[in-house]
Amino acid sequence: MNESSAATRMGLAVVAISTALVVTALAVVPFLNPVWVSFEQGRTGVTALTGWSAPEVRTATDAILHDLIVGPPDFVVTVSRFEVLTDAERAHMRDVRGVFAGFFAVGTLAIAVLLGSFWLSGKGRQGWTRRHAWRGVRLGAAGLVLGTVAAGVVALVAFDAAFEVFHRLFFTSGTYRFDPATSKLVQLFPDAFWSETAVAVGALIVVLAGATAWIAGRRGRATAVAGSAAGGSATGAATRRISEPEPVK
């Protein structure tokens, strides 16, 4: 493998990974809003679990979401002078906020990488072309579809195990397990809430990634056709110049 080929393969991998990160981040954002959270809490019977009225559930949830997304991450929430979260739960939510912040920081970097890859493809340096850039996007999006479907199958078969593995990857052991009978955090966001939200996020990822792969495939083919046409025109012009006899002086 020559140096140019290795660089192209590396570029394809970087673009593919960046595409997967950006699509995933875009799919997560809609589910961080109070409208979805309220809808899903209604479906999973949060008022019955907490023993609170719907307005009280909304007050507590909105405060938690505000500290999670906007900050500061104090997570000091009260309902009828009752402190909703314990010290351990507040510490866990600060950890959650740190994971989200890191994820979206990486997503922002991935956007910059994609923009840079397309800018470089316009320069045609190191053999990196616009066709390569679109191919990387298509590979990343298609791979994300396959990965999401596979993860979805695993989650449907063993959601609790998948949930545990996910938490072990990002959180210290023992900091994220709370008693559903007494923990308001678990009652506000029960397992059914997370399982249904995970399905919705996964479905949106598949839709966005599938559309991205389709668009990237079309753009890549169009770029290849345009490049071939331009190359053919240039070759034809050169042939005509060679075949034309020089004028007699």
PLM region spans:
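Actinobacteria-biased recognition of intrinsically disordered, low-complexity terminal regions
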Residues: 1-8, 220-249
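Juxtamembrane non-transmembrane "cap" segments at the membrane-aqueous interface
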Residues: 154-180
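Individual transmembrane alpha-helix segments
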Residues: 69-109, 191-201
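Hydrophobic secretory-pathway targeting helix
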Residues: 1-37
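Terminal transmembrane helical module of multi-pass membrane proteins
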Residues: 174-227, 246-249
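Hydrophobic alpha-helical membrane-insertion segments
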Residues: 19-29, 54-62, 139-164
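Membrane-interface interhelical loops and short interface/amphipathic helices
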Residues: 38-83
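Juxtamembrane interface at the cytosolic side of transmembrane helices
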Residues: 111-159, 211-227
